[in-house]
Amino acid sequence: MLNLAKELVGDEALGLLKYLIGKKSEITDEEIAKELNTKPNEVRKYLYLLSDHGLVTYRKTKDKDSNLYIYYWKVNVNQINEILLSRKRLILEKLRNRYEQEKDGLFYFCPQDNIKYSFDDAIENEFKCLKCGTSLSQYDSEKARSFLEQKIKQIEEEINKEIRRESSKSY
């Protein structure tokens, strides 16, 4: 699941997420910055990114002395697996759609520029590359289909494994 989180938020934010996973209670952005020896603005930027993806949540209170808001952050433990699982399902759906396109479509490519064209686009351009004018060759989508089949199977297995793990936790 952390690999998917990395794809969503990048290495820097993933490091912060791992740090927060290790925390047992809420922590302020200022405390995080101090502990990680990072600028508070940098920490906030990544916290907001993680929050946008639902991976962390925050609670906001107003400081009585300074009248400023203090944000307390924590990992969204209740939702993190569900969020990442739904992202995997979305990726799986896109891969299946792409597989169907590769399976059902006829494609051409420019051997010079490696640009792929649909059959309709190839006809419209008289089977010439728009970029360099080279004649297009028919594209064998077998490698792409094979790769997509592999990825689809891998993600289906990951999803099923997560579902089994979650259902075993509830008993």
Curated annotation (Swiss-Prot):
Molecular functions (GO terms): DNA binding
Record keyword Ligase present: no
Listed Pfam families: TFIIE_alpha (PF02002)
Cross-referenced PROSITE patterns: HTH_TFE_IIE (PS51344)
Coiled-coil ranges from the UniProt annotation: none
Signal peptide residues on this chain, from the entry's feature table: none
Key words, A-Z: DNA-binding, Transcription, Transcription regulation
HTH TFE/IIEalpha-type domain: residues covered: 1-81
Any Gene Ontology biological process: transcription initiation at RNA polymerase II promoter
InterPro entries to which the protein is assigned, alphabetical: TF_E_archaea, TFE, TFIIE/TFIIEa_HTH, TFIIE_asu, TFIIEa/SarR/Rpc3_HTH_dom, WH-like_DNA-bd_sf, WH_DNA-bd_sf
DNA-binding among keywords: yes
Function: Transcription factor that plays a role in the activation of archaeal genes transcribed by RNA polymerase. Facilitates transcription initiation by enhancing TATA-box recognition by TATA-box-binding protein (Tbp), and transcription factor B (Tfb) and RNA polymerase recruitment. Not absolutely required for transcription in vitro, but particularly important in cases where Tbp or Tfb function is not optimal. It dynamically alters the nucleic acid-binding properties of RNA polymerases by stabilizing the initiation complex and destabilizing elongation complexes.
Oligomeric and partner information: Monomer. Interaction with RNA polymerase subunits RpoF and RpoE is necessary for Tfe stimulatory transcription activity. Able to interact with Tbp and RNA polymerase in the absence of DNA promoter. Interacts both with the preinitiation and elongation complexes.
Family, as annotated: Belongs to the TFE family.
Domain text: The winged helix domain is involved in binding to DNA in the preinitiation complex.
Protein name as catalogued: Transcription factor E
Organism: Sulfolobus acidocaldarius (strain ATCC 33909 / DSM 639 / JCM 8929 / NBRC 15157 / NCIMB 11770)
